């Protein structure tokens, strides 16, 4: 009966402790991890009674974190109202008694913290320049888009204007249209907001398109100058045979492919750079810096192009078309003699058309030189005096550089419509048809028919359309394209 004594002692202890502890002891004896967690949670916290002064050592995950201190750019504004992140702001020193506003927590993704700067509103000192740039850009954009579209549509839809000469002018208008439509909004948006649309892609594509447009203009002027020289020195009759569509496309392909091949280094030269500023946050800018990931041979070629870019730009895209045009005009004047003298094989209307075409080439060259001269001057100044100029001056020179290209694309079609009589007459007829479509009558229709017949007579006798009125029997019949 000795084994009954330990059992009796155990029962007495259990009765003295209580039934709640019995259930806890039974669960603990089963060895469950869940019982241990519940027992730890049911225990009173350490220091609740005897360790009251150690309460400041408690770790609360929701407390305000002072370090690392977030960056507060001056131009940024929080997207949400100021809310205290600490559960007890009075302990953190951000009480209402101090009179200071609560600081916001700027931790998060950059897209949530950064905002696009809008200098247009509220109106400040920089708003006037932003409005001036936008107004100038809108005028250039509207004039250039309407003018270039008009030239392309007139050449495309008119049977009497489909020639190699007018096709070159239409391709010139197409490239100017692309530059104005795609590059102008990106440049103006970057100038106003200091943020770059499409990022690194636009930094490479915009210079490529602008240089390609300059190349198309350069080679087009050279081709037109060669054509004038060929006409002046040719012994063929004044009326030339029809030029097939394949020949026209081949000439345009040479101009386009050559221009884009010369502009390929621009894709490897430019890249996007982001600079933090104390007033405007992060500012996007495009810099000439080849990527270090390029192969060694290609990297050396791009660096060589960067070092020689200024003089290559000046020689190929400025001096070449001007020298070509001046030389061809001097040779043409030398062959034809003084203006009062008329060659035996050319007289009357044909001589007038020849002088008109020469005036067109000279006018295009003068406009091109006038628009590209500021760009070349800015390139030379930046290349030799960039270390002595401020950042604002460099930005202004870059803006002038861009706008000179946009001015060229907007003025060129206006000049073509004013100098070239067939293009200008077709544009006026199109405008009159659009404006007076509902008020037409018998007299108006007869006037329109007479105007059309007059235009056809003028154009068919000019060099713009190579098909003669009475073609030789050996020439194939059909349209030029």
Swiss-Prot record:
It is a multi-pass membrane protein. The keyword Membrane applies. Residues 156-167, 227-251, 332-360, 420-481 are cytoplasmic. It is found in: Cell membrane; Cell projection, Cilium membrane. Glycans are attached at residue 105. Residues 95-107 have a biased composition (Polar residues). G-protein coupled receptor. Has been shown to bind the neuroprotective and glioprotective factor prosaposin (PSAP), leading to endocytosis followed by an ERK phosphorylation cascade. However, other studies have shown that prosaposin does not increase activity. It has been suggested that GPR37L1 is a constitutively active receptor which signals through the guanine nucleotide-binding protein G(s) subunit alpha. Participates in the regulation of postnatal cerebellar development by modulating the Shh pathway. This is G-protein coupled receptor 37-like 1. It comes from Rattus norvegicus. The gene is Gpr37l1.
């Amino acid at each position: 009966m000795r084994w009954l004594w330990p059992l009796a002692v155990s029962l007495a202890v259990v009765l003295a402790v209580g039934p709640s502890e019995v259930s806890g002891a039974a669960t603990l004896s089963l060895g469950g991890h869940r019982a241990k967690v519940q027992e730890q949670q049911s225990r009173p916290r350490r220091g609740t009674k005897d360790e009251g002064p150690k309460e400041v050592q408690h770790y609360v995950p929701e407390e305000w974190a002072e370090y690392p201190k977030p960056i507060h750019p001056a131009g940024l504004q929080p997207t949400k109202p100021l809310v205290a992140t600490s559960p007890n702001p009075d302990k953190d020193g951000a009480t209402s008694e101090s009179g200071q506003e609560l600081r916001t927590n700027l931790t998060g993704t950059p897209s949530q913290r950064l905002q696009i700067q809008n200098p247009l509103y509220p109106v400040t000192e920089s708003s006037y320049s932003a409005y001036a740039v936008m107004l100038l850009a809108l005028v250039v954009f509207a004039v250039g888009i309407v003018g270039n579209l008009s030239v392309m549509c007139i050449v495309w839809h008119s049977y009497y204007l489909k020639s190699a000469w007018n096709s070159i002018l239409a391709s010139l208008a197409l490239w100017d249209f692309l530059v104005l439509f795609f590059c102008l909004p990106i440049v103006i948006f970057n100038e106003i907001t200091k943020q770059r649309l499409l990022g690194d892609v636009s930094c490479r594509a915009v210079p490529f398109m602008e240089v390609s447009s300059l190349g198309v203009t350069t080679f087009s002027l050279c081709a037109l100058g060669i054509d004038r020289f060929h006409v002046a020195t040719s012994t063929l009759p004044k009326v030339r045979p029809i030029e097939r569509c394949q020949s026209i496309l081949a000439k345009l392909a040479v101009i386009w492919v050559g221009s884009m091949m010369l502009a390929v280094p621009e894709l490897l030269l430019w890249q996007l750079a982001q600079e933090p500023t104390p007033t405007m946050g992060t500012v996007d800018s495009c810099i000439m810096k080849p990527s270090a990931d390029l192969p060694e041979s290609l990297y050396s070629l791009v660096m060589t192009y960067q070092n020689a870019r200024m003089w290559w730009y000046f020689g190929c895209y400025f001096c070449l078309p001007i020298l070509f045009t001046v030389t061809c005009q001097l040779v043409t004047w030398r062959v034809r003699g003084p203006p009062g003298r008329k060659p035996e094989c050319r007289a009357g209307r044909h001589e007038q058309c020849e002088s008109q075409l020469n005036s067109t080439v000279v006018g295009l060259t003068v406009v091109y030189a006038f628009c590209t001269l500021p760009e070349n001057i800015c390139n030379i100044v930046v290349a030799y005096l960039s270390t002595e100029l401020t950042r604002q001056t460099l930005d202004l020179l870059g803006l002038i550089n861009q706008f000179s290209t946009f001015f060229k694309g907007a003025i060129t079609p206006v000049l073509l419509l004013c100098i070239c009589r067939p293009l200008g007459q077709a544009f006026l007829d199109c405008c009159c048809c659009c404006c007076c479509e509902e008020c037409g009558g018998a007299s108006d229709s007869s006037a329109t028919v007479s105007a059309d017949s007059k235009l056809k007579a003028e154009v068919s006798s000019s060099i713009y359309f190579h098909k003669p009125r009475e073609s030789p029997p050996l020439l194939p019949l059909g349209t030029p394209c």
